[in-house]
């Protein structure tokens, strides 16, 4: 236990130490200032601007920004859909894999990677060619991450600017994010992963003879380059079906630490970016403190539950007093619990252990974090703007308590912003619960359940929470590669992405037009520790009120049955 706690402390220390300078650098990038490597980046970016006939100096109001974003993402989804259905006729397919078997699986995968979800209802090494993995999935990993960051920055601009309707240039934001932030870090991360044993090649699969004399096929591929952006962009889709528990994706404890670090370094850095751009670092610190408070709480619950173990399994003398089922011995309870918490804290979804094998409360933590919108540090951009919706609700509640018009950063939070905030929070929640309920009541939905009882309900809840939350991890006992789940979870991913982005950009546009009022004696200090605690409380209360009944029938009952030694 001591080693595990030291790992947790070291991880947070390294994360914060690196996120601070990265956050300051990202502020310069998104303020359109010159950065290191300007002589290299500027000409490269100008090529893209000229190809697209875009003037990066032309700023956009929120509706134009949003329209460009939606059209760009729709075209990306369409291109990936077509690529999957034609890969058999294209190069870089040494295994001669056929086209993706059904249109609904291709639709689900295209929606998944475009929305930064990376839900995978297929096995990567037996379904997709190298070209589809590189030109399709990896490209969308970059672009979906850049899109999330662009929305977060547009919201920050809306909060800090005054008397204007402009939020920046969408094309400049995603290009600068990709060239100056994502690509440089990924190059370094790829080399580090290769040094640890992650494979990177375009070779055909290798047939070998095992020690027992049987034949085995070992998959090859350009894994390290995809692994880097998979984690850094909080995407999560694995090259292999086993994801980051596969030794070719995540071979050592050092690679495991690096992958967890990559998942959270940009989301954490964006809090420092926020403080820099609003000229008040305490605002960023307060939101970060609230996130860290929730993160430590969630990690503690997950780790304690897995460390305590499963008494039913322990009674058989199989794995001792800890819950090692579904976990890699090279990682153990500590690294597995930390990875599970990190990957669902962010909208990542990469896994180094099987979440379906976690105990009731151990699996509850990843599920609840996704249901809350993955706002505890969160994904690239998505975590920040998701948490800002809770910030607006907290400020609104505080305003009601003291009898003042709610204000944030000197701007009034009025009825229009509150309505948009509620929409951004309730539409995803309603989608999770409604689609889960319908799946439980239909034969097509029930056909995917491999475990009866409360755990079967947990698998369905987890699947739709993962889809709506744009996470992508799964309780893998759910048979998701069917017409029902491919279409429904595909729609859930689209709703979860754009039903939040559109209200956020609308809020940003409204806030940008307002003037900034100077603080006075009656202004609530949103940069204080009190506000950080209130914000964490609001996140938990909203989550409890919304999802507790469903969770009580799923993972909570699952845990109680386990403690009583009951199986189902």
Place the predicted regions along the sequence by residue.
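Membrane-proximal intracellular helices of multi-pass ion channels
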Residues: 1-568
């Amino acid at each position: 236990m001591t080693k595990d706690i030291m790992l947790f402390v070291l991880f947070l220390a390294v994360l914060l130490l690196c996120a601070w300078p990265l956050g300051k650098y990202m502020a310069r990038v998104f303020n359109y200032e010159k950065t290191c490597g300007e002589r290299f980046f500027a000409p490269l970016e100008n090529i893209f601007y000229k190809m697209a006939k875009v003037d990066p100096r032309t700023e956009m109001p929120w509706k134009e920004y949003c329209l460009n974003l939606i059209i760009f993402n729709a075209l990306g989804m369409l291109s990936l859909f077509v690529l999957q259905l034609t890969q058999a006729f294209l190069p870089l397919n040494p295994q001669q894999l056929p086209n993706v078997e059904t249109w609904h699986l291709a639709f689900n995968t295209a929606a998944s990677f475009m929305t930064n979800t990376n839900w995978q209802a297929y096995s990567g090494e037996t379904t997709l060619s190298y070209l589809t993995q590189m030109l399709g999935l990896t490209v969308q990993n970059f672009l979906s991450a850049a899109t999330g960051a662009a929305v977060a920055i547009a919201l920050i601009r809306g909060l800090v600017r005054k008397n204007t309707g402009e939020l920046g240039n969408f094309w400049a934001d995603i290009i600068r994010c990709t060239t100056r932030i994502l690509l440089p870090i990924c190059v370094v991360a790829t080399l580090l992963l290769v040094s640890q044993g992650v494979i990177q090649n375009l070779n055909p699969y290798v047939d070998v003879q095992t020690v027992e004399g049987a034949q085995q096929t070992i998959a090859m591929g350009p894994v390290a380059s995809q692994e880097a952006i998979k984690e850094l962009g909080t995407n999560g889709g694995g090259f292999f079906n086993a994801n980051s528990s596969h030794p070719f994706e995540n071979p050592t404890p050092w690679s495991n630490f690096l992958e967890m670090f990559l998942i959270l370094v940009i989301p954490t850095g964006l809090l420092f970016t926020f403080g820099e751009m609003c000229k008040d670092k305490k605002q960023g610190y307060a939101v970060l403190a609230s996130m860290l408070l929730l993160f430590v709480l969630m990690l503690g619950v997950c780790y304690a539950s897995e460390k305590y173990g499963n008494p039913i399994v322990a009674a058989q003398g199989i794995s001792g007093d800890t819950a090692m089922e579904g976990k890699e011995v090279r990682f153990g309870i500590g690294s597995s619990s930390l990875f599970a918490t990190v990957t669902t804290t962010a909208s990542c979804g990469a896994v180094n252990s099987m979440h379906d094998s976690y105990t009731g409360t151990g699996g509850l933590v990843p599920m609840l974090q996704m249901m809350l919108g993955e706002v505890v540090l969160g994904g690239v951009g998505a975590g920040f703007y998701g948490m800002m919706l809770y910030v607006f609700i907290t400020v609104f509640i505080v305003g009601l308590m003291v009898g003042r018009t709610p204000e944030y950063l000197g701007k009034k939070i009025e009825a229009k912003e509150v309505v948009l905030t509620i929409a951004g929070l309730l539409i995803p929640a309603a989608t999770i619960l409604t689609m889960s309920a319908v799946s439980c009541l239909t034969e097509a939905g029930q056909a995917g359940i491999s475990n009866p009882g409360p755990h079967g309900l947990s698998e369905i809840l987890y699947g739709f929470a993962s889809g709506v939350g744009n996470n992508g991890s799964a309780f893998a006992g759910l048979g998701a590669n069917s017409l029902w789940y491919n279409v429904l979870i595909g729609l859930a991913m689209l709703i979860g992405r754009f039903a939040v982005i559109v209200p956020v950009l609308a809020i940003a546009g409204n806030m940008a037009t307002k003037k900034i009022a100077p603080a006075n004696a009656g202004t609530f200090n949103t940069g204080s520790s009190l506000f950080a605690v209130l914000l964490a409380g609001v996140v938990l209360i909203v989550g409890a009120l919304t999802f507790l009944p469903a969770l009580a029938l799923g993972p909570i009952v699952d845990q109680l049955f386990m403690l009583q030694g009951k199986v189902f």
